[in-house]
Amino acid sequence: MSVEYINPSTSAPPRGYSHVVKHGNTVYIAGQVARDRDGKTVGVGDAKAQVDQVFKNLEAALAAAGGNLSHIVKTNIFMTHREDLAAYREVRAKYMSNDNPPVSTLILCSGLADPDFRIEIEAIAIVP
């Protein structure tokens, strides 16, 4: 089985990694942050705006691999502010169903790659 490395044109160019790796039906998505396609941070200080951009980036990554958000089976969420959890849940509900949610791990951390980032989400999906 071949391995396909994908960097969607709708995502900011990565530096030293791939946004998406597809092996068979399994899709691995690198941690997505609140950066638009031009590399600008979206929603500095605004948790909802950042979570929304992260989910847009996840959607784009999955679309580039032939999938969508319903194909996600695992997420790892890194969050710098505990008080952003309600905003995360609210925005996530717009993008993902709670009928069969993926397994998930939430990690509170002291910081991410850019001090303006409040959240980062990496995912694994199975695309039929």
What are these regions (language model features)?
Residues 1-56, 60-73, 79-128:
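N-terminal presequence-like segments and the immediate start of the first folded domain
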